[in-house]
Design a protein with these regions (language model features):
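Short boundary segments that mark the start of a structured unit
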Residues: 93-99, 103
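Acidic, glycine-rich calcium-binding repeat modules characteristic of RTX/beta-roll
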Residues: 10-93, 187-748
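Low-complexity acidic/polar repeat-biased segments
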Residues: 1-2, 102-175, 179, 751-803
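Short, intrinsically disordered N-terminal pre-domain segments
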Residues: 1-11
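LRR N-terminal entry segment and analogous cap-like coil->beta motifs
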Residues: 181-183
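General N-terminal targeting signals
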Residues: 66, 100-101, 123, 721, ...
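A general structural signal for short secondary-structure junctions and capping/turn motifs
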Residues: 73-75, 96, 718-720, 753, ...
Length: 803
């Protein structure tokens, strides 16, 4: 810190980098204060104060102004002082003059650490005057790069009644009254409103208009204009051209007009209206990364053109309307700083728009309007609504906790409410509703913990509430909520694979594919994950495929109208498969371990429970049904119902109950080792026992009891009718020289054993035992009982047929 005092002569005084006090005294002095907040006194004479960019806050105690008017007296001229600014940005266009009480503060727009305070000085006393007659030019301020007055500026005094500026391409400072002033055509005017409620019209040219304090109206006119409202409630109209329009702290109205405009009310607390007009505009009501938020309720209207509308770091309830064109709309915060807490409305309008809401806590509405729009809602806590509108839209939400509504509208849309962000997996816990609307839509709530509702509506839609497993024994990213998926009309795919919830899937009209499956193999090809919930799958009208493969839950599958295929392969739960109406149905639960119930439709059904270990109940209906329970371990019940049915329980080991019902049924138990019960029911049935001791009842009708070999257990035939029913034997399986056709008379013996070498079948009418002897009474083969009939039957060779 230095105290520097000049002489009464013309001194050149240089300060230090500290806060100095410099007094030039009399004479025409040149004072350069340098860094630090300095106090400067020129003394008498025409003094020049040299100020460099970033020198700090300097105070001049006795600055001599030009004064009012354009003809200062010789006495005034003798005391006029000059400030010489040096440094980038220290120009007349950037000059800002602020009357703060009795002092005038000089700063520059966009320049930091640069300020001069003129003590006891009025704004109207500051001016630059060009030479006039015999009077030379006199200047209070010379700007960077100048040696004389080039960029002049003009200050209207407090009594001025001017309605227009007088000089083209100049800088004008108004007084603190309510001024109504216009610029000049074809002139790049800079007009500063200062205080008062001013109306400033730049006319044509690239103008810079500043409102200052007060409720101002700024009109840019034709040209690329810059309008700055500053404090209070301002109306800013850019007009034609590419304009920059900046509001302030009040409730401002900004209109860009035609052209590619930039409208800005960043960090404002007011309720502002921004209207871009025609052109590709940028509208900003932006807070900042460091926590300074926009707190007002702002309205941003893009108008025609490809516009960018942003209200990030905002706490107000904002409306962003893109209008026509391909627009981008954003109301977002960030992870480290602020979140958007208001209830915002984003409307894309006509065009291919992008709508974003990230790190938001309010209940927001995002409406894309017509066009192929893209929506991104992430890290959201509120209950948000996303509406795609007409067009092929993409609606995507990420890690959210609210109950969101996503509606695709017309077009082929993609709707996703999944809890996954890049390579970071997390869950979406809200209860979301996704409506596809018209078109072929994709709806997903993968990795979700909420109870979601998905409606495909019209079109061939894909609906998914699935989870994910990662690698051999890796992480599970599972959907846990109880979701409802409605396909609607069309050929739809509904998927809740890798889910832990109890889901409801409704295919609706059309040929649909519904699945609640889930499996993943480890490195030894062992299944280590299955779907866990108790799911309900309803195919609806159409030829549908329903699958709960690799499921641990007890699932209900209803085929509905149409020819359906229902699967529960490798499932462990107790599933119910109902084929429903249709001409043909396939019900397939092979390799399952649960106790499943399979109910066919009215016509043709195929039932497959092969290689299952549970005790299954399978019921046909009135049609022609096929039952396959090959190599099963459980005790199954198979009911054919009306119709000509075929039952195959070959190689099964359980004790099965098979009821043919009405119709001409065929029973095959080849290689089955359990004690099976076969009931033919009404109709002409063919019953074949297995390797175990089976119970065969033909029921009403003319039945055939078939035997493939004599050494496959002793089967009990409870109701054999000797007048018209047949015992069918295999020539290959029995041997003994049997020939195809009706058994020869000599090959049947009624008694306890054979008494000739030609006799092969011996019926003990006292006990009902039926034996086979390959060589009759030759003695080389001991007779084997292979069936037990009722006693006292009048059997003849006509009751036996060899095949």
């Amino acid at each position: 810190m230095a105290n520097i005092i000049g002489t009464i002569s013309n001194d050149t005084l240089l300060g230090t980098s500290s806060a100095d006090t410099i007094n030039g005294k009399a004479g025409n002095d040149i004072i350069t204060a340098k860094l630090g907040n300095d106090t400067l006194t020129g003394g008498g004479g025409n003094d020049k104060f040299v100020y460099n960019l970033g020198d700090g806050i300097d105070t001049i105690t006795d600055f001599g102004g030009v004064g009012k008017g354009t003809n200062p007296t010789p006495g005034v001229i003798a005391e006029v002082d000059t400030i010489k600014f040096q440094g980038s940005g220290l120009t007349a266009r950037n000059l800002l003059l602020t009357q703060n009480g009795t002092n005038l503060e000089i700063t520059f727009e966009g320049v930091n650490d640069t300020k001069i305070v003129l003590n006891n000085f009025k704004l109207e006393d500051l001016d630059n005057l060009k030479a006039s007659g015999t009077r030379p030019a006199i200047a209070n301020i010379i700007f960077d790069g100048q040696t004389s007055i080039i960029d002049s500026f003009n200050v209207l005094d407090a009594n001025s009644t001017e309605t227009t500026i007088g000089i083209k391409n100049t800088v004008t400072f108004l007084n603190d009254l309510a001024n109504n002033i216009i610029g000049l055509n074809n002139s790049d005017d800079v007009i500063n409103g200062q205080g008062g409620n001013d109306k400033i019209d730049g006319l044509s040219g690239n103008d810079l208009l500043r409102g200052g304090t007060g409720n101002d109206t700024l009109i840019g006119g034709l040209g690329d204009d810059t309008l700055i409202g500053n404090a209070d409630n301002d109306s800013l109209v850019g007009g034609a051209g590419n304009d920059s329009v900046v509001g302030g702290a009040g409730n401002d109205t900004l209109n860009g007009g035609s052209g590619n405009d930039f409208l800005n009310v960043d960090s404002s607390s007011g309720n502002n209206l921004l209207d871009g007009g025609n052109g590709n505009d940028t509208l900003s009501a932006l807070g900042d990364y460091y926590g300074e938020v926009v707190s007002g309720n702002n309205t941003l209207k893009g108008g025609a053109g490809n516009d960018f509308l942003i209200a990030d770091y905002s706490t107000g309830n904002n409306l962003l309307d893109g209008g026509d064109g391909n627009d981008e709309l954003s109301v977002s915060g960030d992870y480290y700083s602020a979140v958007v807490s208001g209830n915002n409305t984003l409307k894309g309008g006509i065009g291919d728009d992008t709508l974003k809401a990230i790190f938001v806590t309010g209940d927001n509405l995002l409406d894309g309007g017509a066009g192929n729009d893209y929506f991104w809602l992430n890290i959201a806590d509120g209950n948000n609504t996303l509406i795609g509108g007409a067009g092929n839209d993409t609606l995507r939400t990420g890690i959210n906790t609210g109950n969101n509504l996503l509606s695709g509208g017309d077009g082929n849309d993609s709707l996703t409410a999944s809890g996954v962000e890049g390579y970071r997996f997390d869950n979406n816990s809200g209860n979301n509703t996704l409506n596809g609307g018209l078109g072929d839509d994709t709806l997903k709530v993968d990795y979700s913990r909420g109870a979601n509702l998905l409606n495909g509506d019209d079109g061939n839609d894909y609906l998914s509430g699935s989870g994910y497993t990662y690698g051999y024994g890796g992480a599970y990213y599972i959907t846990t909520g109880n979701n409802t998926l409605n396909g609607g009309s069309g050929k739809d795919t509904l998927n809740v694979d890798y889910s832990e919830g109890d889901n409801l899937l409704n295919g609706g009209d059309g040929d649909d594919y519904l699945t609640a499956s889930g499996y993943e193999f480890d490195e030894d090809y062992e299944v280590y994950y299955q779907t866990l919930g108790d799911n309900t799958l309803n195919g609806g009208a159409g030829n549908d495929t329903l699958s709960v493969d690799y499921s641990q839950g007890s699932n209900l599958l209803n085929g509905g109208a149409g020819d359906d295929a229902l699967y529960g392969v490798y499932s462990t739960g107790d599933n119910f498969l109902n084929g429903g109406d249709g001409f043909y149905n396939l019900l397939y639960v092979a390799y399952s371990s649960g106790n499943n119930t399979l109910a066919g439709g009215a016509s043709y059904n195929d039932f497959v429970i092969d290689y299952s270990t549970g005790n299954n109940l399978v019921s046909g209906s009135n049609g022609i049904d096929y039952f396959s329970a090959i190599a099963c371990f459980g005790n199954n019940t198979l009911n054919g119902g009306a119709g000509n049915d075929y039952f195959d329980i070959s190689y099964s080991s359980g004790n099965n109950l098979v009821n043919g019902g009405d119709g001409n049924d065929i029973f095959n138990t080849f290689g089955a080792t359990g004690k099976n019960t076969l009931n033919g029911g009404n109709g002409n049935d063919t019953l074949t026992g297995g390797s175990g001791d089976d119970s065969l009842t033909g029921g009403a009708g003319i039945d055939t009891f078939a035997f493939n070999s004599f050494n496959q257990g002793i089967d009990r035939i409870s109701d054999f009718n000797a007048t018209n029913e047949i015992i069918q034997v295999s020539a290959v399986g029995f041997g003994g020289g049997l020939s195809a056709g009706v058994l020869q008379t000599s090959q049947l013996r009624i008694g306890t054993s054979a008494n000739t070498s030609t006799q092969r079948f011996i019926y003990n009418s006292t006990t009902g035992a039926l034996f086979f002897d390959q060589d009759g009474n030759a003695g080389g083969f001991a007779q084997v009982e292979f069936a037990r009939l009722s006693a006292g039957l009048s059997l003849t060779n006509e009751n036996f047929v060899v095949v």
